[in-house]
Amino acid sequence: MQLNSTEISELIKKRIAQFDVVSEARNTGTIVSVSDGIIRIHGLSDVMQGEMIALPGNRYAMALNLERDSVGAVVMGPYADLAEGMEVQCTGRILEVPVGRGLLGRVVNTLGQPIDGKGEIENDGFSPVEVIAPGVIDRRSVDQPVQTGYKAVDSMVPIGRGQRELIIGDRQTGKTALAIDAIINQRNSGIKCIYVAIGQKASTIANVVRKLEEHGALANTIVVAASASESAALQYLAPYAGCAMGEYFRDRGEDALIVYDDLSKQAVAYRQISLLLRRPPGREAYPGDVFYLHSRLLERASRVNEDYVEKFTKGEVKGKTGSLTALPIIETQAGDVSAFVPTNVISITDGQIFLESNLFNSGIRPAVNPGISVSRVGGSAQTKVIKKLAGGIRTALAQYRELAAFAQFASDLDDATRKQLSHGEKVTELLKQKQFAPLSVAEQAVVLFAVEFGYLDDVELSKIASFETALLDYSNRNHAEFMQELNKTGNYNDEIKDTLKGILDSFKANSAW
């Protein structure tokens, strides 16, 4: 069969008409330098601050410096094989991490990828790591407690749901132990927990995970790990990733607790990135926006009202408030709380628990310094019974510290001073507590009642610990119903006062400790 020229031209025209041309606009650039996890890229004219840049090998970098002729970006992950001349492209997306209940009980890295060898995670979607904190109208005042299980904390520096309470102290003063015990104490409270480990040894993180598992708290906890071997970029972003995972629960009318361990290392990682990006250094070589680094993170911890939750869930959840409580940890050098990062975080948070190495080394653990530890909003969230019974403890300790300093120089002391010193010593002894041994509200109430109403006056200092153990054992064994009811309500009235008095009277009359 022969085709003439007209048929051929018609056929070509038909094919051309059917040919579908899809033009795809891509914003690409070329790597011009790679050093210490920082890449400089030529091109990318439409890139945005914080945008993810796709690199070869299914990796990403985050654009942090937008300059006239180049873009400075930080690589998320290994960068040894990246070379000058490689092509990269914009994604039009910012960093997002998986969120949802499927993450509970798992250990993940900054990007939300599982690192515990337990298989894939079923998530409920993705959330951006950088989110604007809820506004003033969306918030509600803090009026519900978070029980840490520590007598010293719950009585003197109470923490409320939606509060930011800083744990600050030198290395090896029990900061992580306090935070981990607070997480363990939430295993039956319904509060979901997130533990963010920044710049720690992998062995230390593994030990924390093991302890949480041993005490039945891991099923209720998400562990976000950015160990010391991870890049500075992942250490810098880890707290924001953990916060996004916590906000998932807050925005759905639930309560969550997040521990950042610790923000000093995050600030150091951010300083490293900033200096490599040639940003101008300020005090202690930190960049000018290191305050904003922490303020935008900690402001996201809040208690949100019913309207916010209803609006966020599109009417699925009604009449519930949500909260995200933050326990940031800061490590000081030789007790210097006036350094740059500690003062920044103290000014952002709603109070601080100051742990002192002198107290820790002298056997007072938790080593809480009651003089400069404070909770600015927790008082209104404190359980009624604890609030009523703990009023005299801080005063007694403050007077004891003052008198103890004078007593070193005085040879003869009057009876009132001796009595006050003895009482202070006993209160200090009573506030000591072993790790992984949190007390319930009712147990704390019984102990504080004994302090408040003079039941310790005739107990020798060396027998305080055995007195407390025997008292709690007696209360739980013989008055289990009352203890359960007190744990449930947390109330304090004349009837409860009389019952507590009866417990203490019968215990002292019948028990040898």
Swiss-Prot record:
Q: Mention any Pfam family matching this sequence.
A: ATP-synt_ab_N
Q: Where does ATP bind?
A: 169-176
Q: Which domain of life is it from?
A: Bacteria
Supply one GO molecular-function term: proton-transporting ATP synthase activity, rotational mechanism
Q: Please indicate if the UniProt record lists Cell membrane as a keyword.
A: yes
| Subcellular locations according to the entry | Cell inner membrane
Q: Keywords on this record?
A: ATP synthesis, ATP-binding, Cell inner membrane, Cell membrane, CF(1), Hydrogen ion transport, Ion transport, Membrane, Nucleotide-binding, Translocase, Transport
Question: SUPFAM superfamilies attached here?
Answer: C-terminal domain of alpha and beta subunits of F1 ATP synthase (SSF47917), N-terminal domain of alpha and beta subunits of F1 ATP synthase (SSF50615), P-loop containing nucleoside triphosphate hydrolases (SSF52540)
Mind telling me which GO cellular component terms the entry cites?
A: plasma membrane; proton-transporting ATP synthase complex
What residues correspond to the site Required for activity?
A: 373
Give the Enzyme Commission number. Answer: 7.1.2.2
**Role according to the record:** Produces ATP from ADP in the presence of a proton gradient across the membrane. The alpha chain is a regulatory subunit.
Which family does the similarity line name? Answer: Belongs to the ATPase alpha/beta chains family.
Instruction: Fetch the PANTHER family from UniProt.
Output: ATP SYNTHASE SUBUNIT ALPHA, MITOCHONDRIAL
Q: How does it assemble?
A: F-type ATPases have 2 components, CF(1) - the catalytic core - and CF(0) - the membrane proton channel. CF(1) has five subunits: alpha(3), beta(3), gamma(1), delta(1), epsilon(1). CF(0) has three main subunits: a(1), b(2) and c(9-12). The alpha and beta chains form an alternating ring which encloses part of the gamma chain. CF(1) is attached to CF(0) by a central stalk formed by the gamma and epsilon chains, while a peripheral stalk is formed by the delta and b chains.
Q: What is this protein called?
A: ATP synthase subunit alpha
Q: Which organism is it from?
A: Haemophilus influenzae (strain PittEE)
Q: Which gene encodes it?
A: atpA
